From Swiss-Prot:
The protein's assembly and partners: The RNAP catalytic core consists of 2 alpha, 1 beta, 1 beta' and 1 omega subunit. When a sigma factor is associated with the core the holoenzyme is formed, which can initiate transcription.
Cofactor: binding details: Binds 1 Mg(2+) ion per subunit.
Listed name of the protein: DNA-directed RNA polymerase subunit beta'
InterPro entries named among the record's database cross-references: DNA-dir_RpoC_beta_prime, DNA-dir_RpoC_beta_prime_bact, RNA_pol_asu, RNA_pol_N, RNA_pol_Rpb1_1, RNA_pol_Rpb1_3, RNA_pol_Rpb1_3_sf, RNA_pol_Rpb1_4
Family statement drawn from the similarity comment of this UniProt entry: Belongs to the RNA polymerase beta' chain family.
Cofactor dependency: Mg(2+); Zn(2+)
Amino-acid positions noted as binding Zn(2+) 1 in the UniProt annotation, renumbered to this chain: C61, C63, C76, C79
GO cellular component: DNA-directed RNA polymerase complex
Purpose of the protein: DNA-dependent RNA polymerase catalyzes the transcription of DNA into RNA using the four ribonucleoside triphosphates as substrates.
CDD domains for this protein: RNAP_beta'_C, RNAP_beta'_N
Record GO terms (molecular function): DNA binding; DNA-directed RNA polymerase activity; magnesium ion binding; zinc ion binding
Biological process, per Gene Ontology: DNA-templated transcription
HAMAP family noted in UniProt: RNApol_bact_RpoC
């Protein structure tokens, strides 16, 4: 612990020794009683005893002798209770001394992790279980050597199963025969009796049902041979006590060194044993501590008894477990005192073992303890794991005070950093601050004054009655702190933003329309939550970082996220339309004010093309002086933009005006207007580009310019969408009559396919594919026709077309369905599906030929509604799957924080264009991939030798274009995949932050941002295997979300979609049919050293031809590559590039752009572990899995020192399910999945968690080690005050 700040800096977990438990305990619990049913006070020595756990009431003992704080620390002579606060009942523990040793269930059970006792003793876990549960005996000592050894040390004597029972009996009889043959009967009477006993045992053991206790036989054999047999946890305890860990470690290590193959089962088990023994050796945990001699009784307030109405009580399940343990323990003590026969004794011990097992882990027992309602009781393990467990319910997420929620409505009158909060909500949320102002005795300058009310009660009354005196105070109080707004589901960081509250009437929260995209909110009944930041630091952080007006660009792609939508787009589109021959065309205005006046007098139309001198815009740059030819609307729009910004006239070239837009003085500008090419209006895309320009030019100069300009654009958008009076009507739908000719053709084709199929010339799969493909192309053709149709001049003023063209609402697909045809509908593909078929039939092959305007027939309506409903269920399924994936991504990357400026690595990732090798289409161009990265070496022009991009300097958009234009197709750049930083990554390897276009700041939690950027668009990915351009490829390869899951979880593709890959570099020497099987092709790949034959099913699509060159990992057949196979064949670099390419393919096919570097962050976490093959002179052991940077560091030391051999290792790749549990933190891992396994391993290891990630620190209530968590509080508050002054 860090004493200065009382901040916990690391935590260790381990096995508790019996002495340690007694040291923690405040007393032994010996009675199973809880509370007295009459007085309701805790019973003495019971599970709630005040003497052990502390007083029930603050500073009051049980008998009432001492009351009040003045006796603090005193212990009552009468009842033994310490006088202190009652909160200690949440901290103090007791213990139960067990009458017999008990094995801990986490250490004996095989699942979810290999049984630790089994690994240490090298006895199978089933045998351990049989010994612990008193089924079988185990040999503890082989004897004195006078007799031949019939039983080996640690051998389990199985008497339960028929087969092994027979073997055991014959071994026992053999031993007994040796004994009675060695006895000299003549020597004494005693010998004769012993001989007789041995004979009797010998004869009786021939039968399967024995009339005596087997223990008598063991005791008899023991007295002669010195052999000892044990049963129960006591026997295991003795074995664990006597084990020599150092000797075991050396033996296993030698065996591992000699073993050839590290992947066979025997070697894997040896590695697991070595690991367990090394953990115990290094952690100072003793193996015998895995067997319990006493158990902790948890604090009573964590397992309360609660009184319900009607005098009934309800209690935590944990109490039932403890009661059972205490009852059985006390009974066992009595049985031992009374010297009961061993069969009764063992039975009692077994019952106690089961009771303790149930307390620790009830669910994993074969027959769990059930409650009254026949459900299994919740044991300590269940209290930890899952969504309702301690980690996720209580430690990582808590419910928050000072919060409210309500429905949201649009607030077009708000500024971008404002939110309208209903009065009733403000009165509740800001109540303590309002009361403080009401009872305050000093004014803001510090002078004394009379308070408005004298006490809190009166203040509350004023608030309740909404007295007039409180309004000035409320207005003052709400200015002091912003509020946080959150909309669930919070898929990325923009799901929570800060706003300055404004009082509004009604009960709904008013939300600024521009932030709806970031929240993914709409106004159809969505609700949002409001939270109030309390501390000065939280207020300052909300203002400096979370305030809505700073979030201009989205983190996933660096594109504007506050682009105007819907009405605002429509208004701006209408405003910037250009039409010839409108009222007022050709008028010349002296300045903007004159133009506005004439427009308000309705002498000129908003679409009219007019002239205005360039001198009317003194601060703007023009290519030349003269008369600017533009429209009234565009002048109005440019008037709200910053004065220095260039004049926006042509949406195709916003950055600069062309000479044609300006007519020199003295020339006839009116004739020019009549001949002028009419520019298009500003669409949503144009507005997005304007935001980009604004952000690029002004975000450094002054923070408030961009948001205030956006507010003005929003205002004129709403104003002119109202003025445009755009409406929607059935008569606006374009008329289209061409489709019948396509239908006739395609119907003939479909009939033809049917005939071919009936004659056996086509398979059903081929027929289906061709039919679906034919109808898809008809729909595409109809779609193209309608697209041409609505571009005709007569449709340019059509309301629906305006909405679609502007990007406000609707697209070409809606038009196709409205006036063309609905086309093909999807169906669920396991409906009537033969499993053998390679084609997923997820489309109804009869299309809907009618359009909505014509109306659908009954069968069409049915198919249509079937498809629509499937869409709805898919969306619901997708949302939950995508949410789970985001959680896994966050867990895998939560400790990736930018911790350093430069790790000085000399290795990088080679970037080249990502293209679909099959179709040759570019998925992501090299320009896009290069922007915002640092090259490792100078990028030099191949011809002129000019340095285009110096090493270590950022590549801008212009430089990236230069590099590509120079014909360079590969550039090695810095990448997080090769960052040498041990904790987190460095600034240079990541490059620039997409939201600021500057170098990423130190302490940014880039891992979480990466996870959110990939997870957030996950819901937009399709669930169905969609077909690009009809049905392109014959096979159905998982696409969309399923493909993403395959890549990140490292799931091998299914047999039919798996691609066969080459293992060597060489040439395809031949492709022939197999002589044994005509359905199989044999592809032979040859090089100078070897040749390999690959068997390929006849119906697979080949990717190679004879004579093609292949590399290791090249595809031989079409499909998805198994990543683990690729890793073996081609190495980690190829695998990393393959995953980046495939993930980008999934997203970009859906039109979603994500920066490469986020995918790299995820891949870094999945591929940053290696497994030791040979330890050399290092401290690693063979088979150990370690972090790649640790491995590199250790090897660098070994290479620099003389005569030392470095270790060798192979790269591993883990899926998202495993990656979080491989991080250094057991707390983060345990709070993710497999809680039991991770905590068990950590205990045996004695693992130390140094709290480097975010989750671990949240659990301990520390500030997280990123962002402002690394700054001082004074700095944060100062920044907050600066920001407050900036608000416009």
């Amino acid at each position: 612990m860090n004493s200065k700040s009382s901040r916990i800096t690391s935590i260790q977990i381990g096995l508790a020794s019996p002495e340690k438990i007694r040291e923690w305990s405040n007393g032994e619990v010996t009675k199973s009683e809880t509370i007295n049913y009459k007085s309701l006070k805790p019973e003495k020595d019971g599970l709630f005893d005040e003497a052990i756990f502390g007083p029930v009431k603050d500073y009051e003992c049980a008998c009432g002798k001492y009351k009040k704080i003045k006796f603090r620390g005193k212990i009552c002579e009468k009842c033994g209770v310490e006088i202190t606060e009652s909160i200690v009942r949440r901290e103090r523990v007791g213990h139960i001394e067990l009458a017999a040793p008990i094995a801990h269930i986490w250490m004996t059970k095989e699942l979810p992790c290999p049984s630790k006792i089994s690994l240490v003793l090298d006895i199978s876990y089933k045998e351990i279980e049989q010994v612990v549960y008193f089924v079988n005996y185990i040999v503890l000592d082989e004897g004195n050597g006078k007799f031949p050894k019939n039983f080996n040390f640690k051998e389990v004597i199985d008497l339960s199963s028929q087969k092994s029972s027979k073997e055991t009996r014959s071994k026992l009889r053999k031993t007994l025969r040796e004994i009675y043959e060695s006895i000299d009967v003549e020597a004494s009477m005693e010998n004769a009796i012993k001989h007789k006993i041995a004979r009797t045992f010998y004869d009786t053991l021939a039968e399967s049902n024995m009339p005596f206790s087997i223990e008598e036989v063991f005791n008899f054999i023991s007295s002669f041979t010195g052999m000892r047999f044990g049963i129960g946890a006591e026997a295991i305890l003795e074995l664990l006590k006597n084990i020599d860990l150092d000797k075991e470690y050396k033996d296993i290590y030698e065996k591992l060194r000699k073993s050839e193959n590290t992947s066979d089962i025997k070697t894997k088990k040896l590695v697991r044993r070595l690991e367990a023994i090394k953990w115990l050796k290094d952690s100072n945990n003793k193996p015998e501590w895995m067997i319990l001699k006493n158990i902790v009784v948890t604090p009573p307030d964590t397992r309360p008894i609660i009184q319900l109405e009607g005098g009934k009580f309800t209690t935590s399940d944990i109490n039932s477990f403890y009661r059972k343990i205490i009852i059985r323990n006390e009974r066992l003590k009595r049985v031992i005192q009374n010297n009961a026969p061993s069969i009764i004794l063992n039975n009692e011990k077994r019952l106690l073992q089961e009771a303790v097992d149930a307390l620790f882990d009830n669910a994993s027992r074969k027959k769990p303890l059930l409650g009254k309602d026949k459900r299994p009781l919740k044991s300590l393990s269940e209290h930890l794991k899952g969504k309702q467990g301690l980690f996720r319910q209580n430690l990582l997420g808590k419910r928050v005070d000072y919060s409210g929620r309500s429905v949201i409505v649009i607030g077009p009158e708000l500024k971008m950093y404002q939110v309208g909060i209903p009065v009733s909500m403000i009165l509740k949320l800001f109540k303590p601050f309002i009361i403080h102002e009401l009872i305050k005795k000093t004014d803001d300058e510090g002078n004394t004054k009379d308070p408005i009310v004298s006490n809190i009660k009166s203040a509350e009354k004023l608030i309740l009655n909404q007295d007039n005196t409180i309004w000035p105070i409320i207005n003052k109080v709400i200015k002091q702190r912003p509020v946080l707004l959150n909309r669930a589901p919070t898929l990325h960081r923009l799901g929570i933003q800060a706003f300055e509250p404004i009082l509004v009437e009604g009960k709904a929260i008013r939300l600024h329309p521009l932030v709806t995209t970031a929240f993914n909110a709409d106004f159809d009944g969505d609700q949002m939550a409001v939270h109030v930041p309390l501390s000065p630091e939280a207020v300052a952080e909300a203002r400096t970082i979370i305030l809505a007006s700073w979030h201009i660009l989205g983190p996933k792609d660096g594109k504007p996220i506050i682009t105007p939508t819907q009405d605002m787009v429509l208004g701006n589109y209408y405003l910037t339309m250009e039409k010839l021959n409108m009222p007022g065309q050709g008028m010349l205005f002296a300045n903007v004010d004159e133009l506005k006046t004439v427009y308000q007098m309705k002498k000129v139309h908003v679409h009219s093309i007019i002239g205005i001198p360039t001198s009317a815009f003194p601060k703007k740059q023009f290519p030349k002086d003269g008369i600017l030819i533009t429209t009234v609307g565009k002048v109005i729009l440019n008037d709200v933009l910053p004065e220095e910004m260039s004049y926006l006239n042509n949406p195709d070239n916003l950055e600069e005006l062309s000479d044609n837009d300006i007519v020199e003085w003295g020339k006839d500008y009116r004739t020019f207007i009549e001949k002028k090419k009419v520019y298009k209006a500003f669409t949503k895309k144009t507005l997005s580009e304007i935001v980009n320009i604004l952000h690029r030019k002004y975000s450094d100069a002054s923070l408030e310019i961009v948001p205030s300009t956006m507010d003005k654009i929003k205002d004129i958008g709403f104003e002119y969408s109202t003025k445009s009076a755009t409406t929607i009507s059935a008569f606006d739908v374009p008329e289209y009559t061409e489709k019948e000719k396509y239908f006739e053709e395609t119907d003939k084709k479909v009939e033809e396919m049917k005939k071919y199929y009936q004659k056996g010339l086509l398979t059903d799969d081929e027929r289906y594919k061709k039919v679906v493909s034919a109808w898809s192309s008809v729909t595409n053709q109809v779609s193209k026709d309608i697209e041409k149709l609505i571009q005709k001049p007569e449709y340019l003023t059509n309301s629906i077309v305006i909405m679609a063209n502007s990007g406000a609402r609707g697209n070409i697909s809606n038009f196709t369905q409205l006036s063309g045809m609905r086309g093909l509908m999807s169906k669920s593909y396991n409906y009537d599906q033969k499993q053998k078929s390679k084609v997923i039939k997820d489309t109804i092959e009869v299309p809907i030929k009618n359009s909505f305007i014509e109306g659908l027939t009954v069968s069409e309506y049915f198919n249509s509604s079937y498809g629509a409903r499937k869409g709805m269920t898919d969306t619901a399924m997708k949302t939950s799957k995508s949410g789970y994936m985001t959680r896994k991504l966050v867990d895998a990357t939560q400790d990736v924080i930018v911790n350093n400026e430069d790790c000085k690595t000399k290795k990088g990732t080679i970037l080249e264009v990502i293209e679909d090798t099959k179709s040759g289409s570019v998925i992501e161009s090299l320009n896009e991939r290069l922007i915002n990265r640092f090259p490792i070496f100078d990028v030099v022009h191949p011809k002129s030798k000019k340095v285009l991009a110096p090493a270590g300097e950022i590549i801008t958009k212009a430089v990236a274009n230069e590099i590509v234009d120079a014909g360079i197709d590969k550039v090695e750049v810095r990448s997080v995949l090769h960052c040498k930083e041990e904790n987190g990554i460095c600034q240079k390897c990541f490059g620039t932050d997409l939201t600021t276009n500057k170098l990423v700041e130190k302490y940014t939690a880039i891992g979480v941002i990466a996870a959110q950027s990939i997870g957030e668009p996950g819901t937009q990915l399709t669930m169905r295997t969609f077909h690009t351009g009809g049905v392109s490829s014959g096979t159905n390869i998982a696409q969309g979300f399923e493909r993403l899951k395959q890549l990140f979880d490292i799931i091998p593709p299914k047999q039919w979609e798996k691609s066969i890959i080459s293992e060597i570099e060489g040439k395809v020497s031949s492709i022939k049919a197999s002589p044994d099987n005509p359905n199989i092709l044999v592809v032979t790949i040859k090089n100078s050293k070897e040749s390999i034959n690959y068997k390929v099913p006849f119906d697979s699509e080949l990717r190679v031809e004879e004579g093609d060159k292949v590399k290791p990992g090249s595809k031989i057949t079409e499909g998805s590559i198994d990543v683990k196979e690729l890793l073996k064949v081609a190495g980690i670099e190829v695998v990393r590039n393959y995953i980046i390419k495939e993930v980008q393919k999934v997203y970009r096919l859906q039109g979603i752009e994500i920066a490469d570097k986020y995918i790299e962050v995820i891949i870094r976490q999945l591929t940053n572990k290696v497994q030791i093959q040979d330890s050399g002179n290092s401290d690693f052991f063979i088979g150990q899995i370690i972090d790649i940077n640790t491995f590199r560091k250790e090897n660098e030391k070994l290479i620099l020192s003389d005569d030392k051999v470095p270790a060798t290792a192979v790269n591993l790749i883990f899926g998202l399910d495993e990656a979080p549990s491989k991080t250094g933190s057991f707390l983060a891992a345990a709070s993710f999945q497999d809680t039991k396994k991770i905590l068990t391993d950590a205990c045996v290891k004695g693992q130390i968690d140094s709290l480097n990630g975010l989750k671990e620190n949240v659990i301990f209530g520390n500030l997280i080690p990123c962002g402002t968590g690394k700054k001082s509080n004074e700095d944060i508050i100062e920044e907050g005050n600066k920001m407050y002054e900036l608000e416009y």
